Amino acid sequence: MEKKHLKILRNVRFFTAIVTLAMMAGLTSCKKTDDVPAKPIKYNFSAIPQKSLWLDVAKSQFIIAGTFQVDTIKLKEILETESGYLNFTLSIDSVLKGDLQSKELSFTKYIEKPLSSNDSNLFLLNGKKSIDFFIENPAGNGPLFMLGNIGNSLISKTEDTIKVIANEVKRQQEITDDKTFFSICPNDKNSARVKELIADMHIGTKANDAYIELEKMGFDAVPGIICQMDDRRELALKQISLENKNPDAWEAYSHYNPELVVDVLDAILDQIIGQNFGFIEDGGTEEKRANTVRAWRTYLWHAANDSLEQKQVFQETQKTAD
């Protein structure tokens, strides 16, 4: 009887050993799988549209639903004489993006002569419910500015437009959240070099060379810059000069005085891509910086997820619909 128990015990131990070895083999196999490099992320910057609702939402610091009032007599005077700035007031019903506590808002729009076809909305929507897209005054003080031209900064307020814009604001908050966003960030030599150059920005003797090299890297540096730009450390060199690529520019270089890493990276991104998501090249408020970072993250998310083929299919669909 005792021998029988010993035999059973030996069999149990043998079985346990086999199971243990199998589990170890499985763990080893999993580890090897984890070591296989992930497929590089492809960023299709050519698929980014020139005009899009998501771009307008990303660029805007504030999106407000309400009733705006414009002095149409003053507007006509400007159009009959010369271009100029016109002040507006807006009675606020709700805020779709941004943090505003007031019930009324003053803002400014530059009116060009001749009147743009889109500017007819100033007359059509005067005194009516509308949705307005705003950015802060680039100078950092004074009234808010409307985003771009009237066509994309002032639209009629309906339940459908409110829903669409509110959904886009929510979506951008979700895709720019760290956990979601960092899944599209690269882990390559360009990103590593960007990290090294950002470190050099804290050394007085190396900062200017870091700015120059980062700009020269061009689009190769863009994903790494955007993924690492949420950096509030002070710069060792708080000035940068970037060549004006616009042939109509009145000076050869634009000169900025960034204060933090995020400020100078925004200036370099604007220089490389030609896209502006805020005016923090000379510093800015925490809210302004945070909105700029979110906007650039939204831009990269679309570059990683919107293929050129998808854009072409959409364009063909639009042509068919027209």
Model segments located where?
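Alpha-solenoid HEAT/Armadillo-like helical repeat scaffolds in large eukaryotic proteins
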Residues: 196, 200, 227-236, 252-253, ...
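Structural detector for internal amphipathic alpha-helices that build alpha-solenoid repeat scaffolds
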Residues: 184, 206-217, 239-272
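Residue-level signature of the C-terminal ends
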Residues: 216-217, 228, 232, 271-276
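Bacterial N-terminal signal peptides
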Residues: 16-26
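N-terminal secretory signal peptides that target proteins for export/translocation
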Residues: 1-11
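Transition segments tied to proteolytic processing and entry into folded domains
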Residues: 2, 30-212, 226-227, 246-249, ...
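Eukaryotic acidic, Ser/Thr-rich intrinsically disordered low-complexity regions
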Residues: 286-321
